[in-house]
Amino acid sequence: MVVQDPLLCDLPIQVTLEEVNSQIALEYGQAMTVRVCKMDGEVMPVVVVQNATVLDLKKAIQRYVQLKQEREGGVQHISWSYVWRTYHLTSAGEKLTEDRKKLRDYGIRNRDEVSFIKKLRQK
């Protein structure tokens, strides 16, 4: 049923309700895809609502990675507190430092790219 639906045919076989709802929200313009570029070159298409904050994006990245690991059987545990303590998310050279600030306030729109950049240590 889902495989034959043109709206949902891009979703994986072991799809979750959250992924179906995200895809529907995308189609209705209620959500956007942010392309998160990892340092190894992998691009993760992460779906967030239109008025999402930086914290919402971070949580969506965590959920995306968790689902991918469950499907592929990769590394079981990632210390996200370590990841966010060690790396910044950046967009067009600007660090996304404020978790409560909306993505649109940073100028991030649908299909924009966000990258990880290592934080410099404070002395």
UniProtKB/Swiss-Prot annotation:
<dbReference type="InterPro" id="IPR029071">
    <property type="entry name" value="Ubiquitin-like_domsf"/>
</dbReference>
<keyword id="KW-0508">mRNA splicing</keyword>
<dbReference type="GO" id="GO:0005689">
    <property type="term" value="C:U12-type spliceosomal complex"/>
</dbReference>
<comment type="subunit">
    <text>Component of the U11/U12 snRNPs that are part of the U12-type spliceosome.</text>
</comment>
<keyword id="KW-0507">mRNA processing</keyword>
<dbReference type="GO" id="GO:0000398">
    <property type="term" value="P:mRNA splicing, via spliceosome"/>
</dbReference>
<keyword id="KW-0747">Spliceosome</keyword>
<keyword id="KW-0539">Nucleus</keyword>
<dbReference type="InterPro" id="IPR040610">
    <property type="entry name" value="SNRNP25_ubiquitin"/>
</dbReference>
<dbReference type="Pfam" id="PF18036">
    <property type="entry name" value="Ubiquitin_4"/>
</dbReference>
<dbReference type="GO" id="GO:0005634">
    <property type="term" value="C:nucleus"/>
</dbReference>
<feature type="domain" description="Ubiquitin-like">
    <location>
        <begin position="32"/>
        <end position="123"/>
    </location>
</feature>
<protein>
    <recommendedName>
        <fullName>U11/U12 small nuclear ribonucleoprotein 25 kDa protein</fullName>
    </recommendedName>
</protein>
<dbReference type="InterPro" id="IPR039690">
    <property type="entry name" value="SNRNP25"/>
</dbReference>
